[in-house]
From Swiss-Prot:
It comes from Arabidopsis thaliana. Belongs to the RING-type zinc finger family. ATL subfamily. GO terms for cellular component: membrane. This is Putative RING-H2 finger protein ATL53. The lineage of its organism: Eukaryota, Viridiplantae, Streptophyta, Embryophyta, Tracheophyta. Signal peptide: none annotated. The gene is ATL53.
Length: 310
């Protein structure tokens, strides 16, 4: 068979769109053979298994470590939030307490007025020593029919009524009366009267052996007045007859008398005439008048409380 010397001459008779001839062309790709270099698709489960097996860093130990760190981070964030919230509450509470204290300190500022003024105000944070508090006079309340009565019927600190045989303490200058327990607790952190804010000045000099303090009672006026009764010693319940007369035409307060007596450890008992400072027995009692009430004083060294009974 003789070959055609010019095969290109046949090409002009070949129709590239005719796929029946079995020729590979653009119009007949089914007769073309291609080499596919891409791997076949795999399932999702096979992909996960192959990924874990091919990556040794994602072991259970690594996952556990990441879990521990995540838990620690969450706990630290929770602790930070709780601490911040509690700190804000504490700050707000301290600010409110400071606001109330500022009001008290502003009212009780020592710069307001003269310090020697009996109604001078000072800071409530300055308290008195126990020794100074104990130097303030006190007495036991006695209520009898037609007897003496003190001004006021209750304690301004605890708002409790004064009952018989209760120990009451009389503040100097303002002469306000309070329960001993209540006012002692107040004076440990304050140096003024809780009712009128008058500054409390306790005498530091040694007191006389015999000292009679007259507490404020119901006020009355009379040109000639008298009061008689028995002074009862609180410690040993001893009675001393006392007669008080006044010919001074002025206002004054009848009162329970706290008589503090001690001379070489012995109590003195007898009849006393306090008119014009005359003595009927043992001691000379002097009388003086002040705006706070009648004050009777004698010479002495230590104190013991006594009360007047009608």
């Amino acid at each position: 068979m003789e070959s055609d010397p010019n095969p290109s001459a046949w090409n002009q008779y070949i129709n590239p769109r005719d796929c029946t001839q079995g020729l590979c062309s653009t119009f007949c790709p089914q007769w073309c053979t291609y080499i596919n270099f891409s791997p076949p698709p795999i399932s999702y489960e096979q992909f996960l298994n192959d990924g874990v097996a091919s990556n040794p860093n994602l072991s259970p130990l690594v996952i556990a470590i990441f879990g521990i760190f995540a838990t620690a981070f969450l706990l630290a964030a929770y602790y930070t939030l709780v601490s911040k919230y509690c700190a804000n509450d504490t700050t707000n509470e301290a600010a409110s307490e400071s606001g109330r204290s500022d009001i008290i300190l502003d009212v009780n500022s020592p710069e307001r007025g003269d310090q020697d003024d009996p109604f001078a105000l000072e800071s409530s944070t300055a308290g008195l020593d126990d020794t100074l508090i104990k130097k303030i006079g006190f007495f036991k309340l006695k209520k009898h029919q037609n007897g003496f009565k003190i001004n006021g019927t209750d304690c301004s600190i605890c708002l409790g009524e004064f009952n018989e045989d209760e120990s009451l303490r009389l503040l100097p200058k303002c002469n306000h009366t309070f329960h001993v327990v209540c006012i002692d607790r107040w004076l440990k952190s304050h140096s003024n009267c809780p009712l009128c804010r008058a500054k409390i000045i306790v005498p530091t000099t040694q007191q006389p052996e015999h000292h009679v303090v007259v507490m404020n009672l119901d006020r009355f006026t009379s040109n000639v007045g008298s009061a008689e009764g028995n002074v009862v010693v609180d410690d040993h319940r001893e009675e001393v007859s006392v007669s008080i007369s006044s010919h001074h035409p002025s206002w004054f307060s009848a009162a329970d008398i706290v008589l503090r007596i001690s001379r070489d450890g012995e109590e003195e008992e007898g009849n006393y005439d306090l008119e014009n400072g005359n003595r009927e027995k043992l001691v000379d009692l002097k009388r003086s008048f002040s705006s706070g009430g009648l004050v009777l004083g004698t010479q002495g060294r230590t104190r013991r409380s006594l009360n007047i009974c009608p």
